[in-house]
UniProtKB/Swiss-Prot annotation:
<dbReference type="InterPro" id="IPR020929">
    <property type="entry name" value="Ribosomal_uL5_CS"/>
</dbReference>
<dbReference type="InterPro" id="IPR022803">
    <property type="entry name" value="Ribosomal_uL5_dom_sf"/>
</dbReference>
<keyword id="KW-0699">rRNA-binding</keyword>
<dbReference type="InterPro" id="IPR002132">
    <property type="entry name" value="Ribosomal_uL5"/>
</dbReference>
<dbReference type="Pfam" id="PF00281">
    <property type="entry name" value="Ribosomal_L5"/>
</dbReference>
<dbReference type="GO" id="GO:0019843">
    <property type="term" value="F:rRNA binding"/>
</dbReference>
<keyword id="KW-0689">Ribosomal protein</keyword>
<dbReference type="GO" id="GO:0006412">
    <property type="term" value="P:translation"/>
</dbReference>
<comment type="subunit">
    <text>Part of the 50S ribosomal subunit; contacts the 5S rRNA.</text>
</comment>
<dbReference type="GO" id="GO:0009507">
    <property type="term" value="C:chloroplast"/>
</dbReference>
<keyword id="KW-0694">RNA-binding</keyword>
<dbReference type="Pfam" id="PF00673">
    <property type="entry name" value="Ribosomal_L5_C"/>
</dbReference>
<comment type="similarity">
    <text>Belongs to the universal ribosomal protein uL5 family.</text>
</comment>
<dbReference type="InterPro" id="IPR031310">
    <property type="entry name" value="Ribosomal_uL5_N"/>
</dbReference>
<comment type="function">
    <text>Binds 5S rRNA, forms part of the central protuberance of the 50S subunit.</text>
</comment>
<dbReference type="GO" id="GO:0003735">
    <property type="term" value="F:structural constituent of ribosome"/>
</dbReference>
<keyword id="KW-0934">Plastid</keyword>
């Protein structure tokens, strides 16, 4: 699956973007550098099972084991001590990144209830796109009977684009379903 999206990028998207933006060199064409999947787990500090099940779910979705993010300092109001587990993060690059992007665009996003497309306003000004998902059940790898609680995740697609216009064009050519 990963090779399909990489081939699509090299064979189709690079020439399209070269014509559209007038790049002289194919190395000027923006590309996706990495995809970061993040899940904040505020309640994991009290319950270690939540952390383990979330780590397993994220590794099934991403195809790569996640890293536990820990708190930097203690905050008494949140019942949080220093270096306590507060989330999970996975950074995908290369073939795994293209494979995840393919599954996200073609399998997961269409399975969202009442889906009309994703917002084109979630770019950061430099062509990077952030997307929040409210549940993990949209991924076909997740078994409904094995989840203990519905949890969302944040997905950031980091590109080499210099502005939002290039980012929209790049992701649209990959087939990202933006709202009209």
């Amino acid at each position: 699956m990963a090779q399909r999206f990489k081939e699509l990028y090299l064979q189709t998207i690079v020439p399209k973007l070269k014509d559209e933006f007038g790049y002289k060199n194919s190395h000027q064409v923006p590309e996706i550098k990495k995809i970061v999947i993040n899940r904040g787990l505020g309640d994991a500090s009290q319950n270690a099972k939540i952390l383990d099940s979330s780590l397993n779910e994220l590794s099934i979705i991403a195809g790569q084991r996640g890293v536990v993010t820990r708190s930097k300092k203690a905050i008494a109001g949140f019942k949080l001590r220093d270096k306590m587990a507060v989330g999970i993060s996975v950074t995908l690059r290369g073939d795994r990144m293209y494979s995840f992007l393919d599954r996200l665009i073609n399998l997961a996003l269409p399975r969202i209830r009442d889906f009309q497309g994703i917002s084109p306003k979630s770019f950061d000004g430099c062509g990077n796109y952030s997307l929040g998902l409210e549940e993990q059940l949209m991924f076909p790898e997740i078994d409904y009977d094995k989840i203990d609680q519905v949890r969302g995740m944040d997905i950031s697609i980091v590109t080499t684009c210099s502005n939002n216009e290039e980012g929209v064009a790049l992701l649209k050519n990959f087939g990202m379903p933006f709202k009209a």
